[in-house]
Amino acid sequence: MNDGLYHSMTPTTRLAPGEQVLHAFNPDKGAYWRDHAWIAAVAMAAGMVILWAIGNPHVWTGAVGGLAAVAVRAFYVASDEMQARWDLTDRRLLGPQTRAVHLGEIATIRTLGSAVQVVTRSGDKHLLKYQPDRDATRQRIESAMSGAF
């Protein structure tokens, strides 16, 4: 397999004859850091609660550990996550590498934080992460599904 295609964070699936890209969904740095701030807050609180529950007198170290863990992850994967792109065509939703979902196969579209989850009729789940406006992303996909784009 071509290693460049396998590790690509943009769609590598070829367009069908006559198929047109209607919109490209790119991640947003502000949404990325905002989501990680929320994750860090939860990790800090969880770390403190766990240490308190086991009777550790240094509960504050749970906050430090939670923050450090999320911060390391956030900085480590930021460059990859900011390159991920999804393309919406008049027929399909094309994701990083060779991910492709026919619009007619989409069963459910959900939102969580800044992400939009697309669930197919066969149960496959795809996540468009760190969207600047998750509701607009959802609306664009729904409009393309109904042919009203």
Regions found by a protein language model. Name each.
Residues 55-57, 63-71, 115, 130-143:
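A general structural signal for short secondary-structure boundary/capping elements
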Residues 30-82:
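Alpha-helical transmembrane spans
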Residues 21-24, 87, 117:
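Soluble periplasmic/extracytoplasmic beta-strand elements of cell-envelope proteins
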Residues 2, 19-20, 26, 121-149:
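A membrane-cytosol interface segment of integral membrane proteins
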Residues 1-52:
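N-terminal membrane-targeting/pre-transmembrane regions
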Residues 67-108:
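Conserved beta-hairpin
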